From Swiss-Prot:
Disulfide bonds join C45-C101, C90-C110. One of its GO terms (cellular component) is extracellular region. Keywords: Disulfide bond, Olfaction, Secreted, Sensory transduction, Transport. Belongs to the PBP/GOBP family. This is General odorant-binding protein 72. Present in the aqueous fluid surrounding olfactory sensory dendrites and are thought to aid in the capture and transport of hydrophobic odorants into and through this fluid. Gene3D superfamilies: Pheromone/general odorant binding protein domain. CDD domains: PBP_GOBP (cd23992). InterPro entries: PBP/GOBP, PBP_GOBP_sf. It is found in: Secreted. One of its GO terms (biological process) is sensory perception of smell. GO terms for molecular function: dibutyl phthalate binding; odorant binding.
Length: 121
């Protein structure tokens, strides 16, 4: 299992890919971990970009099996149960939402609500 430090390093790498692409400031990106979600197309597409890179979702659709694997390999042990519970609660939260950026934002908010140990790059 990986350490908290390794997790944060990986998260920074992911963020560096998606942030410039969608012109998201550090303030807006950091606010996510406090439950503040910007209501802009750019932000929602940034979230979609991150979920894609993390292999949690592909174009706004949850990749359940892949996500479970990611939880096992990418997270420290003390975070795994909370992330599994969040995934379980949210796997179909954005079902039927056509716009993948919109769908990603719905998923993110659901994960935040259903996972007490929520962290996002």
């Amino acid at each position: 299992s990986i350490t908290q430090e390794q997790l944060e390093k990986t998260a920074r790498t992911f963020r560096q890919v998606c942030q410039p692409k969608h012109k998201i400031s550090d303030e807006v990106a950091d606010a996510v971990n406090r439950g503040v979600f910007a209501d802009t197309k750019d932000f929602k597409c940034y979230v979609s970009c991150l979920l894609d890179i993390m292999q949690v979702a592909r174009k706004g659709k949850v990749n359940y099996e892949k996500s479970l694997k990611q939880i096992d390999t990418m997270l420290p042990d003390h975070m795994k149960p909370a992330f599994r519970a969040g995934l379980e609660a949210c796997k179909s939260a954005a079902q039927g939402v056509k716009d993948h950026c919109e769908a990603a934002a719905i998923l993110l908010q659901c994960f935040y609500k259903n996972n007490p140990k929520f962290v996002f790059p």
